[in-house]
């Protein structure tokens, strides 16, 4: 991701914010300090499944409008998406990844077939407008 942004969006700067996995008060202060230093930032991405937590921190700090992109169709993420606190959710289809992984393992171990080194997987982009029509997932 960083390399892509550097090569294709050179006028954009990535800013890394490290958050604690379970300390909400510290995280809120960290984000508050970040926006004091970078008040112009209006969009962000998180590469873990807890996008909803960041969305609610931003809501507490009244950072609206803010375009947040998150990962994984966890129920709290979907709720935040529907509430407009997350703009986009990426679904990596973990059940399909698991199926293809087990299939490749079986083909390699049982049938002694060579398996491809790369296996490109679909990623679905979900919004508040299309989430209710998305049927290819299970909430975790």
Which ranges hold each PLM region?
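Alpha-helical elements of Rossmann-like donor-binding domains used by nucleotide-donor carbohydrate transfer enzymes
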Residues: 3, 30-33, 53, 100, ...
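Hinge/cleft segment of the Venus flytrap/periplasmic-binding protein
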Residues: 5-8, 93-140
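Short, well-ordered coil/turn elements that cap or connect secondary structure elements
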Residues: 9-11, 63, 83-84, 120
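A structural micro-motif
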Residues: 12-14, 66, 87
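Short beta-strand elements at the ligand-binding edges of bilobed clamshell
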Residues: 83-95
């Amino acid at each position: 991701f960083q390399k892509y942004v550097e090569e294709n969006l050179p006028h954009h700067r990535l800013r890394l914010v490290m958050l604690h996995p379970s300390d909400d008060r510290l995280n809120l202060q960290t984000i508050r300090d970040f926006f004091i230093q970078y008040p112009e930032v209006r969009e962000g991405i998180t590469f873990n499944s807890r996008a909803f937590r960041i969305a609610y921190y931003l809501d507490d700090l009244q950072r609206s409008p803010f375009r947040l992109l998150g990962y994984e169709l966890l129920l709290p993420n979907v709720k935040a998406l529907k509430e407009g606190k997350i703009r986009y959710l990426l679904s990596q289809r973990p059940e399909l990844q698991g199926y293809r992984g087990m299939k490749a393992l079986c083909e390699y171990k049982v049938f002694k077939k060579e398996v491809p080194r790369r296996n490109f997987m679909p990623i679905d982009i979900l919004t508040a407008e299309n989430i209710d029509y998305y049927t290819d997932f299970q909430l975790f």
